[in-house]
A protein has these predicted regions:
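Structural preference for solvent-exposed beta-strand-turn elements
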Residues: 1-340
Length: 340
């Protein structure tokens, strides 16, 4: 079978988020080829994408070996032959045999059948991108590790901050989705949704289907915390550049699941940014036009960087700070002096 290598690599790239880091579930570190699609599954996420030229191939191949080999092949077209216990790939003067498992042992039946597709609100991905950094990482309160989708609202909170985004249209269904899944989902141009039993499915124009587990439970009512009456504070004009420098030290290589944060402290007419990771620390002091302002808070640094493309001010009350745009609100608890 002659196959376009570039198209095959693109298909494999699309489904990589469904791979597991360790094979706790059999074949969860493999690409499964089923008919005209390639599929991955890791118990939390399953992704499938169309593949051309391999419609008659059914089985699983170790993902790392296949992907890394194809990435090093220079020819645009390759030949793939399915033999008894291996797949033979020929390209130019090279050929490689990869172990091939004919039986698909991934528990894909858990994902369930995909029902009728419904159109998503056009700002749904923007809402997810804005909201998920506010989710908790502490699994002692699993509901707060999720983004809450309810009606025309997309909400997230770690109990220290709350984000609520108002969609232009109501969602076809209500559900809770883990922030870890959202982090991958927002990389796709999803336009349609189908809600199943314990799983929700999204589809792109190219035919990628991204499925992820939903979480059972009730998200807390955050509405009463979102309105703030207080003084307006204007951030320094050079703050975004300072945040970009701080971001180098906010990212933790040993814990990539943790959202990088920065601490913001305002006192005596200065705004002080601090960030720290396992390799070093950062501090920068900026002048403000608010000599009497005194507060501090911690926030996801990439959210704050993106925020300065939208607005440069916030409102300060006795115990919280509020940011607001046309369709969203973000409230953060002010840290006490003991917490500082």
């Amino acid at each position: 079978m002659k196959v376009n290598k570039v198209e095959l690599l693109e298909a494999l790239e699309k489904v990589k988020p469904g791979l597991a880091n360790k094979e706790l579930i059999e074949q969860s570190t493999s690409f499964a080829f089923i008919g005209d699609r390639v599929v991955t599954y890791n118990d939390e996420i399953s992704v499938s994408h169309p593949v051309k030229g391999l419609e008659n191939m059914k089985g699983a191949i170790k993902a790392k070996t296949l992907y890394e080999f194809l990435a090093r092949v220079k020819d645009e077209e390759i030949e793939i032959e399915q033999e008894e216990n291996e797949v033979l790939i020929k390209t130019g003067r090279s050929k490689a045999g990869l172990r091939f498992e004919h039986e698909i042992r991934l528990p894909l039946e858990e994902v369930g059948e995909v029902g009728k597709w419904k159109k998503l609100p056009e700002d749904f991905v923007d809402a997810l991108r804005l909201s998920y950094p506010a989710c908790a990482s502490d699994m002692s309160r699993p509901i707060l590790t999720c983004v809450n989708i309810r009606g025309d609202k997309v909400e997230a909170s770690d109990s220290f901050q709350i984000i609520q985004y108002r969609l232009k249209k109501k969602m076809p269904a209500d559900f809770l989705i883990p922030a870890s899944s959202v982090k991958e989902l927002i990389k796709y141009d999803i336009l349609e949704i189908s809600l199943g039993e314990n799983w929700v499915h999204f589809r792109t124009p190219e035919g990628t289907i991204f499925s992820c587990r939903t979480v059972e439970g009730e998200f807390p009512d955050v509405e009463r915390f979102l309105d703030i009456e207080g003084d307006e504070f204007t951030f320094p004009g050079d703050m975004k550049e300072a945040l970009n420098r701080a971001n180098v030290f906010a990212k933790k290589e040993t814990d990539v699941s943790t959202i990088p944060t920065v601490k913001v402290k305002v006192k005596n007419g200065e705004l002080i940014l601090t960030a720290q990771n396992e390799y070093g620390w950062f501090e920068e002091r900026l002048k403000t036009g608010h000599k009497d302002a005194k507060f501090s808070f911690s926030i996801g640094i990439e959210f704050l960087i993106s925020l300065f493309d939208r607005l440069k001010t916030c409102k300060i009350s006795d115990n919280k700070i509020g940011f607001a745009g046309d369709s969203w609100k973000h409230v953060i608890a002010i840290m006490s002096e003991d917490e500082e």
